A protein has these predicted regions:
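Short helix/strand-bridging catalytic loops that position acidic/His residues to coordinate divalent metals
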Residues: 147-154, 212-216
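C-terminal motif of bacterial Sec signal peptides marking the signal peptidase cleavage site
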Residues: 16-19
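An aromatic- and glycine-enriched ligand-binding surface/loop that stacks and positions planar moieties
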Residues: 21-72, 141, 170-172, 188-353
Length: 407
């Protein structure tokens, strides 16, 4: 009888365990099944997207063709090639699409909508960078695996196809994101950041098409104008006007001027060892603007500097007179006094071409070390640019141009 009882008990235990799923998800690994469950999960995952924004580094934009330093650059030297490029990376897009594919696990609809907006903003930003760099690129809005060979090998989508989806992502992000940054320093994307970047992207595409003889440029210029106007009318941002040199002050302040700066990066060298090396690079790489860059600045009466008789041979101290005030707050000009100093800093002509940048330049202590903390080093978008976007896109598209508020 005891033997029978043991057999029955053993059978019951066997049946019990055979009816259970013994596959346990690892508790220390992030999987779709155990993550994206709440607002905190969504926020933590989307935090990584902010690394997509322009990284501060020692190059400080020297690869552009309006600036030169002692190291030159591939663009200026004419040595840039497909083989030397390093921007054909798609891993961050995968992280974004992975999030959008699994964020539905979160039951908090408000949080889900907000962070989906963050992901859509950064997908649009990711692709805008790619279009500017490569033109036609393949559009992916899903996570690809090794078995998706056909999609992985597909041809590039047209520039217009991708740009339309970029603008749609920015539009969707604007409807989902909050109107105020979740911190007081405007380091988080908002509805206004989405509208600002949408306007920037549309203006870029519209002018690119107009000056390259491509169709549909009017469509993008109209989007740029209407989006910028909405920002101007509704955002509450205004031009920073304090002090005698507000433009210069805005770009060398340790704390972003949040009345104007829509999206900024904040640095903290002492506590977090977060800094940038722009000022160090300007001082030690002999960075200088080109003459062509200088010629872009208009006269104070709105006429072109290059229409001025004898502009080609004009002496340095004369060519900077009566120009757009932003010139003297961007380039070292006579009577320049560095932040924290009381005496004039003379132009020692160590900068190539002689036109030394002062934008982002703070106190002298940052000249000798890569410890700059000016928050608006990454002034990713500001109200001044949106006002310019509105007027430029409206004029190019020949839209009736009301005067935007002066803020």
């Amino acid at each position: 009888m005891k033997a029978i009882n043991k057999i029955i008990i053993l059978g019951m235990v066997t049946t019990l365990f055979s009816s259970c799923d013994l596959t346990l998800l690892p508790e220390n690994a992030v999987t779709p099944e155990n993550y994206f469950q709440n607002k905190s999960d969504l926020e933590l995952w989307t935090n990584q997207f902010y690394t997509l924004l322009d990284e501060p580094d020692a190059s400080a934009g020297t690869n552009a063709d309006d600036m030169i330093d002692k190291g030159m650059g591939q663009v200026i030297e004419g040595t840039r090639s497909a083989a030397s490029e390093t921007g054909w990376s798609w891993s961050k897009l995968r992280h974004i699409n992975y999030f959008l594919q699994h964020s539905s696990n979160c039951d908090d609809e408000t949080a889900r909508s907000q962070y989906n907006g963050v992901a859509q903003f950064f997908r649009a930003y990711f692709y805008f960078v790619k279009v500017r760099r490569y033109g036609d690129v393949p559009w992916y809005n899903q996570v690809l695996g090794s078995e998706d060979q056909e999609l992985l090998a597909k041809a590039r989508d047209s520039r217009e196809f991708v740009m339309d989806r970029i603008l749609k992502d920015f539009e969707d992000a604007a409807t989902s994101l909050p109107t105020k940054s979740t911190d007081t320093r405007n380091t988080r994307v908002t509805k206004w950041a989405a509208l600002a970047f949408a306007s920037r992207a549309a203006l870029y595409e519209g002018t690119y098409r107009k000056y390259h003889g491509l169709d549909n440029y009017e469509k993008y210029l109209e989007i740029a104008a209407s989006t910028a106007k909405q920002f101007i009318d509704e955002s509450g941002f205004s031009l920073y006007k304090e002090g005698t040199e507000p433009y210069r002050d805005m770009f060398c302040a340790d704390n972003a001027k949040t009345t104007e700066v829509v999206l900024a990066r904040v640095y903290n060298f002492e506590g977090l060892q977060l800094s940038h090396s722009v000022q160090f690079s300007i001082a030690n790489l002999q960075m200088g603007f080109t003459r062509r860059f200088m010629n872009h600045y208009l006269m104070t009466d709105g006429t072109r500097f290059t229409d001025k008789q004898g502009y080609e041979t004009m002496f340095y101290t004369d060519e900077v007179k009566d120009r757009d005030p932003r010139l003297q707050q961007t380039v070292l000009c006579p009577n320049y006094i560095q932040k924290g100093e009381t005496t004039v800093t003379a132009n020692d002509l160590t900068a190539y071409c002689g036109y030394r940048p002062i934008k982002f330049v703070g106190t002298k202590e940052h000249d000798g070390a890569a410890k700059s903390t000016s928050s608006t080093r990454i002034c990713l978008e500001n109200a001044n640019e949106l006002s310019a976007n509105f007027r430029n896109s409206s004029s190019l598209a020949q839209i009736p141009l009301p005067r935007p508020p002066s803020a």
